[in-house]
């Protein structure tokens, strides 16, 4: 996805933070490790909670999927059914 497309997606998950979409993009691209308590773990959790898997696949580069689908991220998802869904996705892709 292009930078404007990614920023459009990030703007949809940024409804409750004082940060700008540009700040989130810096964390997303790892130009900054953390801004105001927002890190990549927070972004990935929010993306998985907000979008379907097909949208997630377009946003997150494939080489990031092992981290995206790690327990560190999945354990923060809500509701439990969503956690189970992404555990099944992980097992289908990596096991």
What are these regions (language model features)?
Residues 1-95:
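Long, compositionally biased intrinsically disordered regulatory segments in eukaryotic proteins
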């Amino acid at each position: 996805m292009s930078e404007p497309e990614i920023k459009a997606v990030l703007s949809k998950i940024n409804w409750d933070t004082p940060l700008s979409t540009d700040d989130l993009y810096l964390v997303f691209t790892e130009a900054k490790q953390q801004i105001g308590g927002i890190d990549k773990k927070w972004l990935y959790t929010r993306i998985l909670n907000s979008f379907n898997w097909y949208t997630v696949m377009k946003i997150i580069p494939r080489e990031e999927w092992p981290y995206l689908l790690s327990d560190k991220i999945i354990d923060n998802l809500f509701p439990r059914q969503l956690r189970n869904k992404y555990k099944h996705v992980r097992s289908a892709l990596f096991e």
